[in-house]
């Protein structure tokens, strides 16, 4: 599943084709995605101008001049394929699944007034789209329980310490909880914990001191999360499994992995003689260096 950097890369890649542009026509080839498309889905989108293209956690949000918002999630294998004015197609993001010649996996197609044709391609059909009134967006079940954006001003050591205070769960599990912080996934949590030299097994509650103030662990972790995410966005995300940029190019952040998918390799921390280990934690692979992550 794409994480925050991959979705942000997709958003940036779609902006030239969508933002400020009228949707001339929408075709839904099938509506049985993860959730069925609304019965008025096509009617509410046709003729509308996309006034802005944003992101909340792992969701894309297309603001429309009607006051509606098109909520989009890529699922496990979803991608947007963009053809600009009859030219060669490009794919914003990081995607691996090849597109079928018959285009049977193009489930929703947007034809834009600027000549762009944007196809939502999803072989596994775990992605979904939903139109929500802007006034109702905060109450939308998919969004209302989400924690703060890790790259936003609201996210800081004090906030993270407060969210984790008293939690008996592991630090990694807490960071993957979208109610604590939105948009983080397995890859970038492993990388951020390594950068902060914190064990994924550490109790989440240790981010708060006895007084409730953020501990030194929290003070290290927040900038580590920001650094890892910003570096991944700059690199275009990670090209593991299902995700490729809108240009069709692979992301390069996987070449900068410090621990993820590096089991058995030497730790890259200067002076550390440890080896990267892998273990299963809450059903997911965790990569870390036991020697320097405490």
From Swiss-Prot:
Residues the record lists as binding DNA: 105, 124, 167
Zinc finger map (FPG-type): 258-294
Source superkingdom: Bacteria
Reaction(s) the record says it catalyses: Hydrolysis of DNA containing ring-opened 7-methylguanine residues, releasing 2,6-diamino-4-hydroxy-5-(N-methyl)formamidopyrimidine; 2'-deoxyribonucleotide-(2'-deoxyribose 5'-phosphate)-2'-deoxyribonucleotide-DNA = a 3'-end 2'-deoxyribonucleotide-(2,3-dehydro-2,3-deoxyribose 5'-phosphate)-DNA + a 5'-end 5'-phospho-2'-deoxyribonucleoside-DNA + H(+)
Cofactor needs: Zn(2+)
Keyword Nucleotide-binding belongs to the record: no
Single Gene Ontology BP annotation: base-excision repair
Listed EC numbers: 3.2.2.23, 4.2.99.18
Molecular function, one GO term: 8-oxo-7,8-dihydroguanine DNA N-glycosylase activity
Short name of one Pfam family: Fapy_DNA_glyco
Protein name listed in UniProt: Formamidopyrimidine-DNA glycosylase
UniProt record similarity statement: Belongs to the FPG family.
Subunit structure: Monomer.
CDD domains reported for this sequence: EcFpg-like_N (cd08966)
SUPFAM superfamilies in alphabetical order: Glucocorticoid receptor-like (DNA-binding domain), N-terminal domain of MutM-like DNA repair proteins, S13-like H2TH domain
Residues the record marks as active site: 2-3, 58, 284
Gene responsible for this protein: mutM
Record keywords: DNA damage, DNA repair, DNA-binding, Glycosidase, Hydrolase, Lyase, Metal-binding, Multifunctional enzyme, Zinc, Zinc-finger
Xref: SMART domains: Fapy_DNA_glyco, H2TH
InterPro entries, A to Z: DNA_glyclase/AP_lyase_DNA-bd, DNA_glyclase_Znf_dom_DNA_BS, Formamido-pyr_DNA_Glyclase, FPG_cat, MutM-like_N-ter, Ribosomal_uS13-like_H2TH, Znf_DNA_glyclase/AP_lyase
Cofactor: binding comment: Binds 1 zinc ion per subunit.
Role description: Involved in base excision repair of DNA damaged by oxidation or by mutagenic agents. Acts as a DNA glycosylase that recognizes and removes damaged bases. Has a preference for oxidized purines, such as 7,8-dihydro-8-oxoguanine (8-oxoG). Has AP (apurinic/apyrimidinic) lyase activity and introduces nicks in the DNA strand. Cleaves the DNA backbone by beta-delta elimination to generate a single-strand break at the site of the removed base with both 3'- and 5'-phosphates.
């Amino acid at each position: 599943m794409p994480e925050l950097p991959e979705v942000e890369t997709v958003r940036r890649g779609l902006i030239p084709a969508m933002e400020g542009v009228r949707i001339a026509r929408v075709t839904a080839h099938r509506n049985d995605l993860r959730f069925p498309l609304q019965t008025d889905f096509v009617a509410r989108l046709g003729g509308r101008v996309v006034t802005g293209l944003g992101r909340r956690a792992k969701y894309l949000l297309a603001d429309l001049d009607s006051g509606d918002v098109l909520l989009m999630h890529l699922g496990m294998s979803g991608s947007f394929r963009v053809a600009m004015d009859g030219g060669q197609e490009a794919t914003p993001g990081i995607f691996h699944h090849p597109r079928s010649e018959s285009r049977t996996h193009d489930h929703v197609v947007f034809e834009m007034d600027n000549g762009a044709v944007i196809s939502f391609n999803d072989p596994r059909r775990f992605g979904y789209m939903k139109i929500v009134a802007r006034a109702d967006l905060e109450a939308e079940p998919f969004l209302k329980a989400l924690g703060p954006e890790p790259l936003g001003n609201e996210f800081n050591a004090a906030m993270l310490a407060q969210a984790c205070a008293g939690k008996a769960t592991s630090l990694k599990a807490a960071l993957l909880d979208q109610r604590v912080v939105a948009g983080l996934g397995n890859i970038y949590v492993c990388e951020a914990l390594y950068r902060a030299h914190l064990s994924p097994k550490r109790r989440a509650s240790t981010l708060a001191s006895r007084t409730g103030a953020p501990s030194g662990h929290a003070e290290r972790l927040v900038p580590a999360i920001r650094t890892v995410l910003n570096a991944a966005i700059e690199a275009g995300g990670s090209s593991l499994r299902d995700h490729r940029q809108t240009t069709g190019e692979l992301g390069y952040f996987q070449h900068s992995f410090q621990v993820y998918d590096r089991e058995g390799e030497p730790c890259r921390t200067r002076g550390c003689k440890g080896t990267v280990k892998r273990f299963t934690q809450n059903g997911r692979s965790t990569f870390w260096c036991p020697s320097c992550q405490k």
